[in-house]
């Protein structure tokens, strides 16, 4: 089934070229189907790239989804044209009286700052509080996962001695969990971060379950026992060249950055990267949408939280 997004969003042309079914708003309005209503709070600086990556995964499922793009009003984006934001994005003030089947909170390159020093932290706290009664299930990604774990459960983020950067092997540590259905015994996920949440800190919280982790990258998937909060510390949505872009960007800035691990053949940046996480990324988003949103959300969204 298709994703339903604004007619002129730049991602439309890219996704159509990849044979991902994208439905125009006009066509969708003439179908007698209630699509899942999914909001994406996009706090990445490269918003157009990130929205395309997420829409690619959301559009590769058999479930019709209506997408609402959100941005923090308290933050001025330096890397995305204001015209794009004004045309395709809404602010929290515009949607706070609405209800959603699902919410995705993206990562952001601010993990080395205390949460309270991030200029949109107060607004993000307001959104996460609102989500308890207005969103059925929320998927938090990378720094968004750290922020959600800290806000909802008091789990701290801790500095790493060096950046976790590359594509790493992961293992399931729970069986018979719907989010993990169909996962390989060993699966790969990109990571790009300077901080972590530790197994010990998460394990102290009775309401949380650690579902998957990596010997090198640490805790990866965490879920609340009711399935309404999913936390993914990696970037399964990344496209083939995102880590390459980040590596070259940091080199240009003169930063001390290592070649991303297990990404370039022979760790040679002159070679084409190998994508090992595409299947996992598609399955993660499919399982979240199907088992944690579609099969659980009330038909009348105003019944969320009741």
From Swiss-Prot:
GO terms for biological process: L-methionine biosynthetic process from homoserine via O-succinyl-L-homoserine and cystathionine. Its main location: cytoplasm. The active site is at 142 (acyl-thioester intermediate), 235 (proton acceptor), 237. CDD domains: GATase1_HTS. Substrate binds at residues 163, 192, 249. It is found in: Cytoplasm. Keywords: Acyltransferase, Amino-acid biosynthesis, Cytoplasm, Methionine biosynthesis, Transferase. It catalyses: L-homoserine + acetyl-CoA = O-acetyl-L-homoserine + CoA. The keyword Zinc does not apply. Transfers an acetyl group from acetyl-CoA to L-homoserine, forming acetyl-L-homoserine. Belongs to the MetA family. This is Homoserine O-acetyltransferase. It comes from Ruminiclostridium cellulolyticum (strain ATCC 35319 / DSM 5812 / JCM 6584 / H10).
């Amino acid at each position: 089934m298709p994703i339903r997004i604004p007619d002129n969003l730049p991602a439309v042309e890219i996704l159509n070229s990849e044979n991902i079914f994208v439905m125009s708003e006009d066509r969708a309005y003439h179908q007698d189907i209630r699509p899942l209503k999914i909001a994406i709070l996009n706090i990445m600086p490269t918003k157009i790239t990130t929205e395309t990556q997420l829409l690619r995964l959301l559009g590769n499922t058999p479930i019709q989804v209506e997408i609402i793009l959100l941005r923090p009003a308290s933050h001025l984006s330096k890397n995305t044209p204001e015209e794009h934001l004004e045309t395709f994005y809404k602010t929290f003030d515009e949607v706070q009286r609405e209800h959603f089947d699902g919410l995705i909170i993206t990562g952001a390159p601010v993990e080395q700052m205390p949460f309270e020093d991030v200029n949109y932290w107060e607004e993000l706290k307001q959104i996460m509080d609102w989500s308890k009664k207005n969103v059925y299930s929320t998927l938090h990604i990378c720094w968004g996962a750290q922020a959600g774990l800290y806000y909802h459960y008091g789990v701290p983020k801790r500095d790493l001695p060096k950046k976790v950067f590359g594509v790493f092997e992961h293992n399931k540590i729970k069986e018979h969990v719907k989010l993990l259905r169909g996962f390989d015994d060993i699966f790969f996920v990109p990571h790009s971060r300077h901080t972590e949440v530790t197994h010990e800190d998460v394990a102290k919280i009775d309401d949380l379950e650690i579902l998957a982790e990596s010997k090198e990258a640490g805790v990866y998937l965490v879920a609340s026992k009711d399935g309404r909060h999913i936390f993914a510390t990696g970037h399964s949505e990344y496209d083939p060249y995102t880590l390459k872009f980040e590596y070259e960007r940091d080199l240009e800035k003169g930063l001390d950055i290592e070649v991303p691990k297990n990404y370039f053949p022979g760790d040679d940046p002159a070679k084409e990267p190998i994508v090992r996480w595409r299947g996992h990324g598609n399955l993660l988003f499919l399982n979240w949408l199907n088992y944690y949103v579609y099969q659980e959300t009330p038909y009348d969204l105003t019944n969320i939280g009741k």
